[in-house]
C-alpha cells in the first residue's frame, strides 16, 4: 500500500535486493518488473501484477571524490540519508524537493524537482543501469543517452549506481 493508501500493490513475485548482482539476476530472469522504494508515489507507477523489486535495502553510499565533490550511491539510498552524509563533508545538492524520504533512484527516474527550479537529475554525472537482459550499462556525461536516462521512468532500464556532482554547502537568506 502506498503512503496515502490510494495504491495497492499486487504482484506475482517480490524480491528485496541488496547488491547490484542480485538486481541484475532478478531483472534477467523476470519478464516484466516494477521497481519500488519508499512508496511515496500517489500514482500507481510502481504497482502491477508482475515482479516487484524493492530497492530499499540497496542503500549504500559507495564512494566520495573529494577533489571533484562527487558522491556515488546505490539507487535505494534515501535522499535524506544522502544529504546528511554530504553535509558532513561540507557539500550539498542545490536542487532539493520538499520531501527527503524518497529513494535516489525513484527521485531521478520520475523527474523530481526542487528549490532551485532545476531537476535533481541535472546533478547526476554518471550512473550504471541494469538492462532488461540483466547486463550492466555504464553511462556518463559524454554518453548521448545521459539526458534520456536522467528521467526515464525505468523504460530504458533500472538505475543501479548513481554519481552526483555536489557543490559547497551554503546558507539561504530570506528577505521580506
Model-found features: residue ranges?
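FAD-binding subdomain of flavoenzyme oxidoreductases
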Residues: 107-176
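Residue-level marker of motif borders
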Residues: 14, 33-34, 71, 101, ...
Amino acid at each position: 500500500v502506498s503512503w496515502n493508501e490510494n495504491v495497492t500493490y499486487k504482484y506475482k513475485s517480490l524480491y528485496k535486493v541488496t547488491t547490484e548482482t542480485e538486481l541484475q539476476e532478478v531483472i534477467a530472469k523476470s519478464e516484466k518488473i516494477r521497481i519500488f522504494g519508499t512508496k511515496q508515489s500517489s500514482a500507481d507507477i510502481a504497482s502491477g501484477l508482475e515482479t516487484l523489486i524493492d530497492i530499499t535495502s540497496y542503500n549504500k553510499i559507495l564512494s566520495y571524490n573529494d577533489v571533484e565533490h562527487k558522491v556515488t550511491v546505490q539507487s535505494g539510498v534515501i535522499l535524506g540519508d544522502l544529504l546528511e552524509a554530504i553535509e558532513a563533508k561540507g557539500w550539498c545538492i542545490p536542487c532539493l524537493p520538499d520531501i527527503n524520504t524518497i529513494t535516489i533512484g525513484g527521485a531521478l527516474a520520475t523527474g523530481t524537482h526542487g528549490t532551485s527550479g532545476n531537476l535533481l537529475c541535472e546533478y547526476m554525472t554518471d550512473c550504471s543501469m541494469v538492462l532488461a537482459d540483466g547486463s550492466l550499462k555504464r553511462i556518463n556525461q559524454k554518453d548521448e543517452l545521459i539526458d534520456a536516462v536522467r528521467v526515464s521512468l525505468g523504460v530504458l532500464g533500472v538505475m543501479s549506481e548513481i554519481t552526483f556532482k555536489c557543490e559547497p554547502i551554503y546558507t539561504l537568506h530570506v528577505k521580506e
